[in-house]
Amino acid sequence: MKKYNRIFTIVVDSLGIGETEDSKEYGDIGVDTLRHISESVESFNIPNLQKLGLANLHSINHVEPVEKPLAYFMKMKEASVGKDTMTGHWEMMGLKIEKPFQTFTDTGFPQELLDELSKRTGRSIVGNKSASGTEILDELGEHQIKTGDMIVYTSADSVLQICGHEENEIFGLDELYRCCEIARDLTLKDEWKVGRVIARPYVGMKKGEFKRTSNRHDYALKPYGTTVLNTLKDNGLDVISVGKIKDIFDGEGITESNASKSSVHGMEQTLEIMDKDFKGVCFVNLVDFDALWGHRRNPIGYAEELEKFDVNLEKLLNKLKEDDLLIITADHGNDPTYKGTDHTREYVPFLAYSPSMTGNGLMETSNSFATIGATIAENFEIDMPKNTIGQSVLEKLL
């Protein structure tokens, strides 16, 4: 069987392609991130995704299917319970999450947790509600500058987020990270457990001028079991992460990490990594689609971000070697035309391409995201870890 020396797996964060049979159980009716983005703009220029076969896989306004797509493609349905970042990525690497991470979206965090966090950090706490990052800064940024109080908030995800002004005399990065480490320790308790604690540094001095910086840091839970990434690393293969992949897996199974300032930067980093001689996986997360456009319900911004991605995708396609494999996918949906600000439970795309391929076309829908991890494992002739899921499609990539 043909083996690939390098596999580039790119997660276009939140690029869902239509509701699943169980979407209604998650409050998501009629959702379709990609389709609804395309219906919100007057033109949509993604020629390289089109060339791979994205419009053959799923109906996209302004983008026609092509007669001979370059890639193999299919829809994947999440087997795990949930629709968040960690669940999606962990499943890609073989873990099925049976119990969703708890959220505090509607209630805020328990007073007992806040009291303990305040006591251990020595700071008063304001916020304690679900909000977008821009909203919470406009509301409480000036207050923090005056008082030094810690801004704590959450979202539709299983997260506890803390905002801190980057300038030391006001709050400072070191102090923000210290507070987040304390929060992570506290939220390991079952009744307070969240998937991630996120440090959200910002700059600016008044409402309307506050901006979050790229010094964000995620303090994630370790995966609940051994993933394909661990097995790759244990077998001497390279696992190079770009974007928030390292944070999502709490560093487990990663041999080299690259933090990104934006999704465009993430693609630029990936293009640089392509010049390296390595054997293994480059695992990329491009978060701006989700963070800047999906949650903020901005379909036009989302479409423009996809067009920027497509420009760099052309460069990537041109740099692929005969023994490279490219996989493009997503971790959940986030329909920017849907009510609220939450992720949406959707199918995600699987596009697989190598310059050495002689075939192409539609494959049968996968019943889990773990197809990715299983395919990677078979390619590098390593066993799937115990208690993992996933069926490889390597033999179908001709």
Swiss-Prot record:
GO MF annotation terms: magnesium ion binding; manganese ion binding; phosphopentomutase activity
Biological process annotations from GO: 2-deoxyribose 1-phosphate catabolic process; 5-phosphoribose 1-diphosphate biosynthetic process; metabolic compound salvage; nucleotide metabolic process
UniProt main location, coarse: cytoplasm
Catalytic reactions on record: 2-deoxy-alpha-D-ribose 1-phosphate = 2-deoxy-D-ribose 5-phosphate; alpha-D-ribose 1-phosphate = D-ribose 5-phosphate
Cofactor binding note from Swiss-Prot or TrEMBL: Binds 2 manganese ions.
Cofactor(s) the protein requires to work: Mn(2+)
Residues bound to Mn(2+) 2: D290, H295, H343
Pathway annotation: Carbohydrate degradation; 2-deoxy-D-ribose 1-phosphate degradation; D-glyceraldehyde 3-phosphate and acetaldehyde from 2-deoxy-alpha-D-ribose 1-phosphate: step 1/2
Pfam (any one): Metalloenzyme
Gene Ontology terms: cellular component: cytosol
Catalytic class of the enzyme: isomerase
S-S pairs: none
InterPro entries membership: Alkaline_phosphatase_core_sf, DeoB, Metalloenzyme, Phosphopentomutase_DeoB_cap_sf
Protein localization: Cytoplasm
Family: Belongs to the phosphopentomutase family.
UniProt name for this protein: Phosphopentomutase
Organism the protein comes from: Clostridium tetani (strain Massachusetts / E88)
Organism classification: Bacteria, Bacillati, Bacillota, Clostridia, Eubacteriales
